[in-house]
Amino acid sequence: MEQTYVMVKPDGVERGLIGEIVAKIEKKGIKLVAGKLMQIDRTLAEQHYAEHIGKPFFEDLIGFITSGPVFAMVLEGDDVIKTARRMMGKTNPLEADPGTIRAEYAIHTNRNVIHGSDSPESAKREIQLFFEPHEILSYEKAVDTWI
């Protein structure tokens, strides 16, 4: 079963959207196997966004992601990386398809509510960055027997 990392960013947490976003994900049949509300410090933010070091928007990105709490999650399911990315929608909420999380909740490209891993490699790296192995649970959902 594939796993991915998804994070409700500070703007989503501050606007009280965690529950709605998690509900949307779970209604799709995706399993939440880890989740925690946390404050990201600069060191962790720089590790997470290492590929953007040196880019003009880097300092603003670090400032934003450390500005308030985030809700970090590990999701599990068949093709969960692709499915979660499709559910999130395009980075720019004005270009996101109707019904996607960003189309419904994001206000601006720089305040787009949610982050999700874009590949199996980034998912593995981000999960290891934000979670200890013992924090990721294995369980069966009642609906699993029907799928």
From Swiss-Prot:
GO molecular function annotations of the record: ATP binding; metal ion binding; nucleoside diphosphate kinase activity
Catalytic activity: a 2'-deoxyribonucleoside 5'-diphosphate + ATP = a 2'-deoxyribonucleoside 5'-triphosphate + ADP; a ribonucleoside 5'-diphosphate + ATP = a ribonucleoside 5'-triphosphate + ADP
Family matches, as SMART domains: NDK
Any one Gene Ontology cellular component term annotated for this protein: cytoplasm
Function in brief: Major role in the synthesis of nucleoside triphosphates other than ATP. The ATP gamma phosphate is transferred to the NDP beta phosphate via a ping-pong mechanism, using a phosphorylated active-site intermediate.
Family per record: Belongs to the NDK family.
Assembly and interaction partners: Homotetramer.
NCBIfam families: PRK00668.1
Name listed for the protein in its UniProt record: Nucleoside diphosphate kinase
Species assigned in the record: Listeria innocua serovar 6a (strain ATCC BAA-680 / CLIP 11262)
